[in-house]
């Protein structure tokens, strides 16, 4: 009974949106299929596909490098690589715009070191970059956990048969972590289609942007867009649940009688790829974690110095917090 009540409570907003679309002044079918409705839907799906695909590749690569190779300091990297999750996308996007623009502290520090980081973060490219950097941990965390728990027998057999590490990864490891990659990618997809702050700052109009913009003067269109967003989210959630259950069943079949985690995961020596791998991990952490932190620290220091000079200090009340 409790589950039914909870489900009904969550279904009420969706039912209200559908009722408003059906009872609107325009034909629901014409409204849902009009170019002004489908255009933001296409942009949203385009951005979500790009972000989820990039996050899948980046998160999987980082998970493999930090859990299955002899990367220098990999225990440290395993701690800091998922930390960009602490930044809300809106805060991260604002920090990027401020820090990497000419005159920003990160831009100026890089210029002093001989690097040119001048870039205009806006539109599809800016939204894609920011959302990828702050959502790849949704792929990294489940993939890293899966890599750490895989039985080593399959990989050992492949190596004994003469397969190189890259071939072992593609033929043995990747099929076993595929469900984790797919589930994490769908979470990134869902996060992207529901995001408002980052796309707003990047001036890229998606469903959430258009819903907010049309909520006062074109409510029929606003509710139609909200219904599309709701249906898209439900499809993604259903797909994620299906893939997670299928992955659990596949994992049980693959492991069989083997005890998961009974031996340490095999370590792949990086060799000549040690420097590029370290550069990849350090570069991602620098962009996604350190760069926004520097910008936020610069904002805080600027506010403190302003208050010391007699200016208005930065104040927050409960309305701002809540």
Question: Can you describe what each PLM-predicted range is?
Answer:
Residues 193-217, 255-256:
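Glycine-rich helix-loop "coupling/hinge" segments at transmembrane-helix boundaries
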Residues 150-153:
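Short glycine/proline-centered loop/turn elements that form peptide/ligand docking sites
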Residues 157-158, 168, 172, 211:
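Hydrophobic positions on the alpha-helical face of helix-turn-helix-like DNA-binding modules
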Residues 27, 203-213, 292-298, 306-309, ...:
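Short hydrophobic, aromatic-rich alpha-helical segments embedded in or entering the lipid bilayer
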Residues 156, 164, 249-267, 304-317:
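Juxtamembrane inter-helical linkers in multi-pass membrane proteins
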Residues 161-163, 175:
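Glycine/proline-centered hinge or cleavage motifs at structural transition points of membrane proteins
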